[in-house]
Amino acid sequence: MAFSGRARPCIIPENEEIPRAALNTVHEANGTEDERAVSKLQRRHSDVKVYKEFCDFYAKFNMANALASATCERCKGGFAPAETIVNSNGELYHEQCFVCAQCFQQFPEGLFYEERT
């Protein structure tokens, strides 16, 4: 099978760096230099960047799915994507639903601790 009119992909050596002379002769069709990994380390950094971007997307996707099925412990309603959520001992609440168990007053913003009597 011949690739007429198409350039072959470059083979990157595994155990040594590409000589500078070879890099200077590699140009794209528009006259700019081709972006190729020069060493294993550079390839590794590129792989890490792609992996991190994939992980960030996957984490956001999973968080969106988790919030879609999460419900408030008090009102049993769902959560909006940009809504503030209070997590107390693994139970999720809307900010306005998280109230004192004795007087049912909302807490001012900040950290809270349970007092055991």
UniProtKB/Swiss-Prot annotation:
The keyword Zinc applies. It is found in: Cytoplasm. Residues 70-117 form the LIM zinc-binding domain. GO terms for molecular function: metal ion binding. Detected in testis. It holds the Pfam family LIM. Coiled coil: none annotated. This is LIM and senescent cell antigen-like-containing domain protein 3. It comes from Homo sapiens (Human).
